[in-house]
Regions:
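Ser/Thr/Gly-rich flexible loops in soluble cytosolic domains mediating phosphotransfer, phosphorylation
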Residues: 75-102
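Generic structural signal for helix capping and beta-alpha/helix-loop junctions
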Residues: 42-44, 86
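Conserved active-site segments centered on acidic
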Residues: 2-39
Length: 102
């Protein structure tokens, strides 16, 4: 089971993407727990997730967010704007899988 946290400005705008990622995970046979949170809560959730993704609207926080995630050995990346805008759950799930595989 991979625990994935998506972090955006308020934790709401990623809701539809989370649903599409859950559908993609189920279709691919990937056991995943995927939730959306406000970026301001990253430090609270980082110890309990396997991968963190930032929404494009909070990409400016990547350096600070990476410091938080590095302390917990959690890989982090910014969701590509195109994948985010198209709500492409499969591509974002593929990004997660690439982060945890190496």
């Amino acid at each position: 089971m991979v625990k994935i946290g998506l972090f955006c400005a308020a934790g709401f705008s990623t809701g539809m993407l989370v649903n599409n990622m859950k559908i993609a995970a189920q279709a691919s046979g990937v056991e995943a727990e995927i939730e959306a949170f406000s970026q301001s809560k990253l430090a609270d959730y980082a110890p309990n997730i396997d991968v963190a993704l930032l929404g494009p609207q909070v990409a400016y926080t990547l350096d600070k967010s990476k410091e938080i995630c590095d302390k917990c050995d959690v890989p982090i990346a910014v969701i590509p704007m195109m994948d985010y805008g198209m709500l492409d759950g499969k591509k974002v799930l593929d990004l997660v899988l690439s982060l945890i595989s190496g």
